[in-house]
Structures are given as structure tokens and as C-alpha cells.
């Protein structure tokens, strides 16, 4: 049997025991991938960071351990990184 964790509506996107952890990093837009990874892992050490070109089609399942980094052609963060 499998279970699905759905993203709740509203500002708090966390559904687990990590309610005090940061869930988005707007300050990282324009930074390098390495800078972004370093900051995110300081805030959320268990994060699985996935780097993708901006515009990539992704699955819709919500995972509290995943942060996607959408990068431009210069490998700079193009969208706000978020848990999910």
C-alpha cells in the first residue's frame, strides 16, 4: 500500500514534524547552484536537491524532503527554490 503526501493550501507547506524548518528560499534567485545547495542544506540537512533547467516538466507529487532548483543557461537559480 502506498501513501501520498499532499501539499496543503496556504502558506505553510509542511505536513510533518519539521514545522519550524524553512520551505522556500527567495533570496537564492540569481545565485549559483553551489551557493544555493550550501544554503538549503544548512537550513534543511535532509533535503534531496534536484537541479533542472527552467521550464522542465516535473511530476506533481509533493515530497517534504525534495527541493528543486530550476536554473537558467548560466546555471543561476531562475525560480524560487521550494520544498516539494
Curated annotation (Swiss-Prot):
List the GO molecular function terms: serine-type endopeptidase inhibitor activity
Where is this gene product found? Secreted
Listed under GO biological process in this entry are: response to wounding
- SUPFAM superfamilies linked to this entry: CI-2 family of serine protease inhibitors
Question: What are the boundaries of the signal sequence?
Answer: 1-12
Q: Which Pfam families does the record associate with it?
A: potato_inhibit
Q: How does activity depend on temperature?
A: Optimum temperature is 25 degrees Celsius when incubation is carried out at pH 7.0-9.0.
What are the site positions for Reactive bond? 60-61
Q: Where is the composition biased (Basic and acidic residues)?
A: 15-25
InterPro entries, A to Z: Prot_inh_pot1, Prot_inh_pot1_sf
Q: Where is this region: Disordered?
A: 1-28
Alphabetical GO CC annotations of the entry are: extracellular region
Sorted keywords for this record are: Protease inhibitor, Secreted, Serine protease inhibitor, Signal
Q: Locate the transmembrane regions by residue number.
A: none
> Taking the first listed entry, what is the main subcellular location of this protein, grouped into a coarse class?
secreted
Task of the protein: Inhibits B.lichenoformis subtilisin, B.subtilis subtilisin, bovine pancreatic alpha-chymotrypsin and porcine alpha-chymotrypsin with Ki of 3.92 nM, 5.70 nM, 7.24 nM and 9.35 nM respectively. B.lichenoformis subtilisin is inhibited with a molar ratio of 1:0.87. Also inhibits chymotrypsin-like activities from the digestive tracts of the insect larvae T.molitor, P.interpunctella and H.armigera. Does not inhibit bovine pancreatic trypsin, porcine pancreatic elastase, or human leukocyte elastase.
**Protein family per UniProt:** Belongs to the protease inhibitor I13 (potato type I serine protease inhibitor) family.
Subunit structure, briefly?
Monomer.
Name of this chain's protein: Subtilisin-chymotrypsin inhibitor WSCI
Which species is the source of this protein? Answer: Triticum aestivum (Wheat)
Its lineage opens with:
Eukaryota, Viridiplantae, Streptophyta, Embryophyta, Tracheophyta
Amino acid at each position: 500500500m502506498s501513501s501520498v503526501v499532499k501539499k496543503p493550501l496556504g502558506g505553510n507547506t509542511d505536513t510533518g514534524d519539521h514545522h519550524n524548518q524553512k520551505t522556500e528560499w527567495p533570496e537564492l534567485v540569481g545565485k549559483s547552484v553551489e551557493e544555493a545547495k550550501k544554503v538549503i542544506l544548512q537550513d534543511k540537512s535532509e533535503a534531496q536537491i534536484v537541479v533542472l533547467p527552467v521550464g522542465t516538466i516535473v511530476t506533481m507529487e509533493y515530497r517534504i524532503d525534495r527541493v528543486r532548483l530550476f536554473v537558467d543557461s548560466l546555471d543561476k537559480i531562475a525560480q524560487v527554490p521550494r520544498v516539494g
